[in-house]
From Swiss-Prot:
Record keywords: Disulfide bond, Olfaction, Sensory transduction, Signal, Transport
Cited function: Present in the aqueous fluid surrounding olfactory sensory dendrites and are thought to aid in the capture and transport of hydrophobic odorants into and through this fluid.
GO biological process, one term: sensory perception of smell
GO molecular function: odorant binding
Name of this protein: General odorant-binding protein 2
Signal sequence, renumbered to the chain: 1-18
Family: Belongs to the PBP/GOBP family.
Cystine crosslinks: 40-75, 71-129, 118-138
Amino acid sequence: MTSKSCLLLVAMVTLTTSVMGTAEVMSHVTAHFGKALEECREESGLSAEVLEEFQHFWREDFEVVHRELGCAIICMSNKFSLLQDDSRMHHVNMHDYVKSFPNGHVLSEKLVELIHNCEKKYDTMTDDCDRVVKVAACFKVDAKAAGIAPEVTMIEAVMEKY
């Protein structure tokens, strides 16, 4: 094996391990965050059907479009002190929350960056629930593109821990 081939192999293994690590951490974050969903169902006006669908947030066919989802995400985020008073992400608290999971440090910077970039896109929207559902949809697309979105099976595997 030439030195160039060896370097390429090391780079590919490192990148794959990094992406797999962040997706695994994201599965923990998703499972833990999702535990607040039932508590927030009534407060946000989430129907039983949308509640059931929301359990599959990361699936390709799940569309993040319902205003009530935005309201539920606000409620859930407030349970963990992840938002400021204006319903925008509290960067320090979000970093700390993500870092509280095993290997969370490998994900926190990227997750906060992606959410912040999505928040900037919809900053002029005045309805918090509408804005947050748009931010969530944007984040889902960007997280998948960045390779940090977890597989549904990964989330199911860690659900019992939370």
